[in-house]
Amino acid sequence: MLRVLGLAGMLMSFNIHAAMISPVSGVKILFANGTEVDEPLEPMEVDAKSAQLVVRYAAELGSGSNQKVFDSAPFVITIDNLSEDIKLYPPKVFSYEQANREFNTSPKWRIEGVSGKEISYSQEKLKGNDGFMPYYGMEALIAKHNEERGIVFSAGVVKAEVVTTDKMVEKPATTKNADALVQLQHWYKQASTEERKAFRKWMVDQE
């Protein structure tokens, strides 16, 4: 499913190139230009000359009895010159231990344009909260990251289904618990393996 991120005034501008960004081989794009991505593993279009992508890598590594699922911390990747369609490749890692070493420093992502040239980028590891599940509430963490650096986006997601109404519809009180459950399930899926283990331990301690 494609998601289009566009500048607020894109309908008035004719010189902005819509670039397709495709994650490859276990790369998940969680946020793009401050907006959460609905389908982290799917290609998306960005209507901007630059892009900030919050990504993480998840894959089953190793072989046989040594196979483990690796989930990286989120990284903030900034592409200053987005002039063509690109593919985002993860670092070349083949074991859980190798991946741990690679993602403890500055992982070597590869961003390749359709022209075949490598696209330059900068990156930072997203700073999480203290304690277990440090990346719970990732939207707030990204907002803080950008605020500290003076980064502001005028981009927004244009979805296929657009519903307009003249009045705000108040949610019934009975839906609050369901909403909380959905949100918890969402962040559990986004959490790394270690974060999930810590969360399950915390749940047992509450009983």
Curated annotation (Swiss-Prot):
The keyword Metal-binding does not apply. Keywords: Signal. It holds the Pfam family DUF2057. InterPro entries: UPF0319 (IPR018635). Residues 1-18 form the signal peptide. It comes from the Bacteria. Belongs to the UPF0319 family. This is UPF0319 protein VV2327.
